[in-house]
Amino acid sequence: MLVFAVGGQEFALPLGGIVEIARARTPTPVPGAEPGVLGIVPFRGAMVTVIDGRLRLGLPGAPMGRAGSMIVLRDSGELVGLVVDAVARVALIHPAEREPLPAALRLARTDLFLGVVPRRDGGYLFLLDAGAVLRPAP
């Protein structure tokens, strides 16, 4: 899984749909785009829809132009870029390490999460469902 940081928290996505990790660039806004869609950027001869990872994960947005990375994913043949604060590492997560979301967590969109992996510091690594992250809230 690819581990990355957004808003001071660590999240992870399965490697399967990830095409590339690129430097975040300022996208061209698209009129009428859904909330959280920052715009589009050219990428290797194609256009990538750029999504604000903070807003999609229910965190306060940050202004574009900040240092960050864009995780480019393929979803149903389309390229989508998820802007994150930083990419940390690739981690092997054993199924036995995965736990359900703690009931005490108050999350706006539980559909985004496959579960959590408890960390030694008492926090959690949040495991994300890539397909759900790329779709707007129902």
Residue ranges and their predicted role:
Residues M1-P138:
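An acidic, low-aromatic, low-complexity terminal/linker signal
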